[in-house]
Curated annotation (Swiss-Prot):
Its main location: nucleus. Pfam families: K-box, SRF-TF. The keyword Membrane does not apply. The lineage of its organism: Eukaryota, Viridiplantae, Streptophyta, Embryophyta, Tracheophyta. Transcriptional activator that regulates root development by controlling meristem size and patterning of the root apical meristem. Regulates auxin transport and gradients in the root meristematic cells via direct regulation of the auxin efflux carrier PIN1 and PIN4 gene expression. Binds specifically to the CArG-box DNA sequences in the promoter regions of PIN1 and PIN4 genes. Involved in the regulation of shoot apical meristem (SAM) cell identities and transitions. Promotes flowering transition and participates in flower meristem maintenance and determinacy. It comes from Arabidopsis thaliana (Mouse-ear cress). This is Agamous-like MADS-box protein AGL14.
Length: 221
C-alpha cells in the first residue's frame, strides 16, 4: 500500500500533533547524531516542544560552545562581506573617475582644436556652442574684475584727495598761526622801539636864552 504524502500544515488534533512531534523529534535527534559521527561535523540541535519543554543535542562538549563558534563565524563573515563591499565600491568609484578623466581629456583636446577628425557635424556644433558659452562667461568675469579694479582705483583716488585736503587745511592753519605769532612779535618790538626812542629832552642853556641848543642823549640800556 502506497503511503500518501503528508500535507504540510498544522495538525489540528492535539493528540495526533503530540505523537507526530515525538516521532519527528526523535528522528531529527538521530539524524543529527549520525551526521556528527559519519561526517565528523559539529552539530548543535535545540528543540522546544509546543508546551515549552527543551530538547537539545550537541556533538561538542556543550551547545553554548557551538553557539559561540557560530556567532564568531557570523561576525567574521559580516566583516569579510563589508570589506568586499568596500573593495567593490572603491573599484566602481575608481572606474567611474577614470571614465570622467578620459572624457574630460577628450573634451579638452577638442576645445584646443585637436582630435576633431572623427567628430560629426552635431558634435562640432555642440562644441562650438559650448565654446561660445565659455567665451561669454569669460568676458563677463573679465568685465566684473575690471569694474572692481576701477572702483578700487576710484576709492583710492577719493582717499588721496581727502588726505590732500586735510594736509592743505592743516598747513593753512599752521601758516595762520605762524603769521599771528609774527604779527604779535612785531607789535611788541615796535612798542619796545618806541619806548627806547622816547627822548628826555634836556635843555642846556648855553648862552642867551634866545639861542638854545638841544642835545640828544642816546637811549640808556
Amino acid at each position: 500500500m502506497v503511503r500518501g504524502k503528508t500535507e504540510m500544515k498544522r495538525i489540528e488534533n492535539a493528540t495526533s500533533r503530540q505523537v507526530t512531534f515525538s516521532k519527528r523529534r526523535n528522528g531529527l535527534l538521530k539524524k543529527a547524531f549520525e551526521l556528527s559521527v559519519l561526517c565528523d561535523a559539529e552539530v548543535a540541535l535545540i528543540i522546544f516542544s509546543p508546551r515549552g519543554k527543551l530538547y537539545e543535542f550537541s556533538s561538542s562538549s556543550s551547545i553554548p560552545k557551538t553557539v559561540e563558534r557560530y556567532q564568531k563565524r557570523i561576525q567574521d563573515l559580516g566583516s569579510n562581506h563589508k570589506r568586499n563591499d568596500n573593495s567593490q565600491q572603491s573599484k566602481d568609484e575608481t572606474y567611474g573617475l577614470a571614465r570622467k578623466i578620459e572624457h574630460l581629456e577628450i573634451s579638452t583636446r577638442k576645445m584646443m582644436g585637436e582630435g576633431l577628425d572623427a567628430s560629426s557635424i552635431e558634435e562640432l556644433q555642440q562644441l562650438e556652442n559650448q565654446l561660445d558659452r565659455s567665451l561669454m562667461k569669460i568676458r563677463a568675469k573679465k568685465y566684473q574684475l575690471l569694474r572692481e579694479e576701477t572702483e578700487k582705483l576710484k576709492e583710492k583716488e577719493r582717499n588721496l584727495i581727502a588726505e590732500n585736503k586735510m594736509l592743505m587745511e592743516k598747513c593753512e592753519m599752521q601758516g595762520r598761526g605762524i603769521i599771528g605769532r609774527i604779527s604779535s612779535s612785531s607789535s611788541t618790538s615796535e612798542l619796545d622801539i618806541d619806548d627806547n626812542e622816547m627822548e628826555v629832552v634836556t635843555d642846556l642853556f648855553i648862552g642867551p636864552p634866545e639861542t638854545r641848543h638841544f642835545k640828544k642823549f642816546p637811549p640808556s640800556n
